[in-house]
């Protein structure tokens, strides 16, 4: 399969779908490590180790429960299951599950800090973590797809379809001029859940500015990011946040 001709996850063949599952496991491990590193940086080793214990115990239970239920294995020293014996549909289902576990892991870390040290410290750690995870994920995707060093807006469009979030949320792209496009998050798992509960949007703009700016620049340093709207900003019903990417 020529990956340069692949535009979205569903276009991958069997082998590369399996490779992407493994790559997403790698991403969640790095994200976990970056959370610990930032908590250590912000609060010191002692508090970080205490929070790590709480977060790791909860995170381990959440993730292993989902994985063991989906794959039908008992928890015992880890059980290797050959991914290539799974159908492509099973691999995609597992990939989506890993993505949800990644988001749950993010929430576990956020709440572990919030419940012990307050919302402000949790948001500081969250935004700092994204400043490191976004460039990492961008580089991981560039490596997976064999993108060039400066793949331009078309490279960014493709890369956005391979983020972990692409397995969780519903997103779309609106082309503008030849040197820009708008990326919309039409359904956000976190914000949609809050909406169902009658809660206000979670104010994620500070994190989003870091997340999308750093991701785009890591894909191609010539790309600039503009926030069209992101909570707590008002937004239309069709999207929760929207971002304009321009090639300079």
Where are these regions (language model features)?
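N-terminal accessory segment detector
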Residues: 1-181, 189-191, 195-203, 207, ...
